[in-house]
Amino acid sequence: MDTPNTFQNDDEIKAQAQVWKHMFGFAETIMLRSTVSLGIPDIIHNNGPVTLSQLVTHLPLKSTSIDRFHHFMRYLVHMQLFTISTDQITKEDKYELTPASKLLVHGHQKSLAPYVMLQTHPEEFSVWSHVINVLDGKKPYWESNDTSMYEKTEGDPEINEILNDAMTSHSTFMLPALVSGLMKENVLDGVASIVDVGGNSGVVAKGIVDAFPHVKCSVMDLNHVIERVIKNPKLDYVAGDMFTSIPNADAILLKSTLHNYEDDDCIKILNIAKEALPSTGGKVILVEIVVDTENLPLFTSARLSMGMDMMLMSGKERTKKEWEDLLRKANFTSHQVIPIMAIESIIVAYS
C-alpha cells in the first residue's frame, strides 16, 4: 500500500495561508469599524500612551472583560493599528497610535473615521451579500433595499448624515492633493469661475477659493442638501439637478460623481456640463479613480475594491481606456489625466 505523502511544500503552505487570510478577511473590516465605534484612537490621542486598564476606563461600555479586551487589542496590534511599548518605570505595556490609527481620530483634517463608518455600515454588508447577482445584470442595492441608493439616502436621515459626514471627511482629506495637482498642471489658468457640481458642504469649493483667490466658485447640489449646509460667504450656492441644467462657468468640477452612474447617465451629465461652458476654452474637471493607473500602486487593492462596491450600487469605476471612451462619446476634443497623491486622479476634459 502506498504511504500518503504528508509533506507539504512551501507553495502549499503559502496557498493555505492565503485562503485562511481571505476566509477571515471580514474580521479586519469589523475590527476596524469596532475600534472607530469605541473611539479607541480618540482615547489614545487624547491621553497619550495608555495601559490596557487605563484604556478600559475610557471605553463607552458599562463593563469590560480585561482578558477579552486584551485579545481584542492584540488583534488590532496585529493589524498595525496600534503599537505596544513598555514603560521603563512601571514595566507596564502601553498602547500607542500608528500612522494608520492617526487617520481614525475624529475631528482631524486628515481623518477617515467617518468614511470607515459609511463603508462598514451593516447595510453595506447587506448589499455585498448579493454580489453574485450583479453578474446577470441585477441591481444588488435594489434587491437589498427595494429602492435606489439615492432615494434611500434622501429618505433616511441617519444614513443621509453618515453619507454626508463621510463625503465631507473624504473631501477634506484629499483636498491638499487635489489643490496641488491643479496648481502643478496650471489647470485653473484662465479660469475665472467654477461650479462644483454635487459639492455638498462646499469643502472642496472653499479649498479651491482659498488656493485660487481669482476664481469665483459656486456649489451646486440638490435642494435638500443646499438647505441644510452651513453657508460660506466666499461661495455661492445653487440648488438644482445636474440631469436638468448646470449654471454657466469657465470650468465645471465633478468630484466622485460619475462613478455613481453607468455610461449613458454619465454622458448625459457630461453633455449638460459642456453646455454650461463657454464656446472656447472651457473644461470639465473630474476627480475620479482611474483603476489601472500606475500612480501609487499601494492603492491598487482599494481601487479594485471600490470598483466592486460601485458596481453593487449600479455605478462604475473606470480604467484609462474606459474614461477615454466615455469622454469621446460625450464629444470632448481631448483630455488629460493628472496623477495626484490620492486614490483618485484628476481628469481634465476640454470642450
Curated annotation (Swiss-Prot):
Domain of life: Eukaryota
Molecular function terms from GO: columbamine O-methyltransferase activity; O-methyltransferase activity; protein dimerization activity; tetrahydrocolumbamine 2-O-methyltransferase activity
Catalytic residues, chain numbering: H259 (proton acceptor)
Keywords: Alkaloid metabolism, Methyltransferase, S-adenosyl-L-methionine, Transferase
A UniProt-annotated Pfam family: Methyltransf_2
Catalytic class of the enzyme: transferase
Keyword Methyltransferase attached: yes
Keyword Chloroplast: no
UniProt: S-adenosyl-L-methionine binding residues: G198, D221, D241, M242, K255
Annotated metabolic or biological route of this protein: Alkaloid biosynthesis; palmatine biosynthesis; palmatine from columbamine: step 1/1
Documented EC number(s): 2.1.1.118, 2.1.1.89
GO biological process, one term: alkaloid metabolic process
Catalytic activity: columbamine + S-adenosyl-L-methionine = palmatine + S-adenosyl-L-homocysteine + H(+); (S)-tetrahydrocolumbamine + S-adenosyl-L-methionine = (S)-tetrahydropalmatine + S-adenosyl-L-homocysteine + H(+)
Biological role: Catalyzes the conversion of tetrahydrocolumbamine to (S)-tetrahydropalmatine and of columbamine to palmatine, an isoquinoline alkaloid.
Assigned protein family: Belongs to the class I-like SAM-binding methyltransferase superfamily. Cation-independent O-methyltransferase family. COMT subfamily.
Name of the protein in question: Columbamine O-methyltransferase
Naturally occurring in which organism (per UniProt): Coptis japonica
